[in-house]
Amino acid sequence: MALTKAEVAEHLFEKVGLSKRDAKDMVEIFFEEIRETLESGDQVKLSGFGNFDLRLKSERPGRNPKTGEDIPISARKVVTFRPGQKLKSRVEDGNSD
């Protein structure tokens, strides 16, 4: 099962006491801030959680799986996530508190 933005907003509504509208807006603003920071080429560091980075992938050779034709895969930027030590430990230990 995946956690959705709507579910995060619902948790904020239930646990923090924000209105449903404010909770939804807060979640949207949070993710928009991450998007804008990455778009500007900066790293996002969430203490105790992990880091989002942009990585440049160079052009490389590829192949069309249907035709077998060689095609170049163009250079591009990709978003990477590196979990922090606290997150890694909690996931590895199965700790839910």
Curated annotation (Swiss-Prot):
GO terms for molecular function: DNA binding; structural constituent of chromatin. It holds the Pfam family Bac_DNA_binding. GO terms for biological process: DNA recombination; positive regulation of metabolic process; regulation of DNA-templated transcription; regulation of translation. The keyword Cell membrane does not apply. The keyword DNA-binding applies. PROSITE patterns: HISTONE_LIKE. CDD domains: IHF_A (cd13835). Keywords: DNA recombination, DNA-binding, Transcription, Transcription regulation, Translation regulation. Heterodimer of an alpha and a beta chain. Belongs to the bacterial histone-like protein family. PANTHER family: DNA-BINDING PROTEIN HU, INTEGRATION HOST FACTOR SUBUNIT ALPHA. This is Integration host factor subunit alpha. It comes from Colwellia psychrerythraea (strain 34H / ATCC BAA-681).
